[in-house]
Design a protein with these regions (language model features):
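N-terminal phosphate-binding loop and adjacent alpha-helix
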Residues: 25-51, 77-80
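Gly/Thr-rich phosphate-binding beta-strand-loop-beta motif of the actin/hexokinase/Hsp70
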Residues: 1-31, 58-62, 157-195, 199-202, ...
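Glycine-rich phosphate-binding loop plus the immediately following alpha-helix
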Residues: 130-152, 180-226
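Adenine-nucleotide phosphate-binding core of ATP-dependent small-molecule kinases
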Residues: 202-203, 212-261, 268
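Glycine-rich phosphate-binding loops at beta-strand->alpha-helix junctions
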Residues: 259-287
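Short glycine-rich phosphate-binding loop at a beta-alpha junction
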Residues: 52-65, 143-144, 256-268
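Active-site neighborhood for divalent-cation/phosphate handling
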Residues: 64-159, 294
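Glycine-rich phosphate-binding/hydrolytic loop that grips phosphoryl groups
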Residues: 151, 288-329
Length: 329
């Protein structure tokens, strides 16, 4: 049996999930969230509490960027690699970046608009940021540092020919476009849970309380009477959700293929009726909370909402165990 501890790290919040794999069956053995002042101590306690002293640990990249290159499909593998390198050099020259300051990986996907071309998705991250993250885990068994924009797709299995968006509303929001089981695009926007939690924290003076307020908040849609007295922090939440909804709408409207489903996950997905809120802006797609297939395949007494809170951590563990995109070069 294989296992992995997925740890999703934000500015002052950790989400973790220990996942085991037996053949094609996955199981969540332990999970949770934790606010922290000292990241090293928080990781140490999570490792101790989950008995993960020798368990491989997978964490998320910090402040990564996604670049896209259009490449002729008939090129050899070596020529494709050279083309990606040349495109990245051009990007660095145009932006006056030091090329050697970045660690890079790329994956190749089909170009749905032109069958004679392929699309290279390149993930880049500053080496200083990357080394900082490695230092946090230097006393533990670090197995991988993964971009959450691609890892989140490993949380469930999509139908063939299904075209979807995964909107991961964490500290920042990543919107992952998937066409026919292939990741096609990842966009990151600054509007996300950090924006909301910081607003609530200004009056509540507690980030953990702000998080619980989000979990207890219900968004009233056009068909339900709004009782603002019972929802004092809606004014802190709705503006961020609106900005996210407009970005999703833009992506759906400009997509070269019809998006059938928009899956919602991340911290802001625990707000009650958030799927109904987004549905009002996206009548052509079905808006759903993203449930990990790992839960649907296993009988459990745990509330599905508790699992959804840590989807990002589950996805990091699952990708390290062989699910999702495995072809980053």
């Amino acid at each position: 049996m294989q296992n992995c501890l997925g740890i999703y790290i934000e500015n002052n919040l950790i989400k973790y999930a220990k996942v085991s794999k037996d053949r094609d069956t996955f199981k969540v053995d332990a999970f949770g969230i934790r606010f922290f002042d000292n990241l090293n101590e928080a990781i140490k306690k999570i490792v101790e509490e989950t008995y993960s002293f020798n368990t491989p640990i997978s964490i998320n990249l910090a402040n990564e960027r996604y670049l896209y290159y259009d490449i002729f499909a008939l090129l050899s593998k070596n020529d494709i690699q050279k083309t990606v390198e040349t495109e990245f050099e051009t990007f660095c020259d145009e932006n006056k970046y030091n090329q050697k300051a970045f660690e890079t990986r790329y994956a190749l996907v089909s170009n749905v608009q032109n069958k004679e071309r392929i699309k290279a998705i390149q993930v880049i991250v500053n080496k200083i940021e990357l080394n900082k993250q490695k230092q946090y885990l230097e006393k533990h068994n670090l197995s991988g540092i993964l971009p959450i924009g691609t890892a989140i797709a490993s949380i469930t299995r999509f139908e063939k020919k299904e075209n979807v968006l995964i909107v991961n509303m964490e500290e920042k929001t990543t919107i992952t476009t998937i066409y026919d089981r292939q990741i096609y695009n990842v966009e990151t926007i600054d509007h996300g849970s950090q924006e909301v939690l910081e607003k609530i924290n200004r009056t509540e003076n507690s980030m953990s309380k702000a998080y619980e307020i989000c979990k207890g908040t219900t968004i009233y849609t056009a068909n339900v009477i709004d009782d603002a007295k019972e929802q004092p922090h809606l004014e802190d939440i709705i503006p961020t959700l609106y900005q996210i909804s407009q970005k999703i709408k833009e992506i759906v409207d400009e997509s070269p293929v019809k998006i059938s489903t928009v899956y919602l996950t991340g911290t802001l997905s625990v707000i009650n009726n958030v799927d109904l809120y987004f549905q009002e802006f996206l009548p052509s797609a079905d808006c759903k909370i993203l449930k990990p297939s790992i839960v649907e395949l296993n009988v459990t007494q745990i509330n599905i909402k508790d699992y959804i809170e840590v989807n990002s951590a589950i996805s990091l563990a699952m990708q390290s165990l062989g699910e999702g995109m495995q072809s980053l070069n």
